[in-house]
């Protein structure tokens, strides 16, 4: 699963504003 998240995180950071991207990153990290 870590490989999938590593692929998604950069994409989320590009599509979403930094503040929202950080929130999503925290949620994904907690999900793991």
Curated annotation (Swiss-Prot):
Processed by the macrocyclase-peptidase enzyme POPB to yield a toxic cyclic octapeptide. POPB first removes 10 residues from the N-terminus. Conformational trapping of the remaining peptide forces the enzyme to release this intermediate rather than proceed to macrocyclization. The enzyme rebinds the remaining peptide in a different conformation and catalyzes macrocyclization of the N-terminal 8 residues. Keywords: Toxin. It comes from the Eukaryota. Residues 1-10, 19-32 form a propeptide. There is a cross-link at residues 11-18 (Cyclopeptide (Ile-Pro)). The keyword Ubl conjugation does not apply. GO terms for molecular function: toxin activity. Probable toxin that belongs to the MSDIN-like toxin family responsible for a large number of food poisoning cases and deaths. Belongs to the MSDIN fungal toxin family. This is MSDIN-like toxin proprotein a. It comes from Amanita phalloides (Death cap). The gene is MSDa.
